[in-house]
Amino acid sequence: DYLHDSLDFNRDLIKNPEATFYGRVSGDSMIEAGICDGDIAVIDRSLQPSDGDIIVAFVNGEFTIKYIDLSHKPEGYIELRPANHAYSPIHIDADDNFRVWGVVVWTIKQWRR
């Protein structure tokens, strides 16, 4: 049997269409969070990141997708944490060229090619 309603990912997944975009994930630094190379990340740029959110950030000339750890903000830095023990956290302080690009709200996987 098939679903009676058609799927509309724009309607079903995107709350802020003007500020939402997608990007294809490259790399394996978030595999323990279930985000794998080739997945599609749906990113909402209108959201302020909260501690523990998965974000896309621009760090010193490169994009990365990581958990954001804001618990060290009073000490003057934040950390971007991978979900793969083979990688180290990224320590961000005032000397870094850092910008939160958006908050990951969904990921989409392709299971069959």
Regions found by a protein language model. Name each.
Residues 1-113:
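Acidic/glycine-rich C-terminal interaction modules and beta/coil loop segments
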